[in-house]
Amino acid sequence: MPRVKRGVTSQARHKKVLKAAKGYTGRNNSCFRIAKQKVEKGLQYAYRDRKNLKREMRRLWIARINAATRLHGMSYSQFMNGLNKAGIELDRKVLSELAISEPESFGTLVEQAKAAL
């Protein structure tokens, strides 16, 4: 059985990790063993924060909608309840965009929600 030398594959693997560690400071971007740990941790953070981003954006949308509805004398929960009863199915992202970019249109939505209550 011939001897298998893995120089090419290990070199490619090292190169891939060091390329991913580009931009890190100190030995974190040049020493393979340390760079491997930092890249792995970075991927863990990225995975975690992709989940957290969804939560944070939803919280932001709710805060924006709440602020806009309070200008019209209504709370967020009353507004959402009114929208559901009126049969208006807009998600929070669209509602927050409407509240910022088109306050008049948002005002009509608030009036419809009030009428449905």
Swiss-Prot record:
Keywords: Ribonucleoprotein, Ribosomal protein, RNA-binding, rRNA-binding
UniProt xrefs under Pfam families: Ribosomal_L20
GO CC field: ribonucleoprotein complex; ribosome
Gene3D superfamilies: 6.10.160.10, Ribosomal protein L20
Superkingdom to which the source organism belongs: Bacteria
Annotated SUPFAM superfamilies: Ribosomal protein L20
One GO MF term attached to the UniProt entry: structural constituent of ribosome
Alphabetical GO biological process terms: ribosomal large subunit assembly; translation
Keyword RNA-binding: yes
HAMAP family: Ribosomal_bL20
Family label: Belongs to the bacterial ribosomal protein bL20 family.
Functional description taken from the UniProt entry: Binds directly to 23S ribosomal RNA and is necessary for the in vitro assembly process of the 50S ribosomal subunit. It is not involved in the protein synthesizing functions of that subunit.
PANTHER family: 39S RIBOSOMAL PROTEIN L20
Protein name: Large ribosomal subunit protein bL20
Species per Swiss-Prot/TrEMBL record: Magnetococcus marinus (strain ATCC BAA-1437 / JCM 17883 / MC-1)
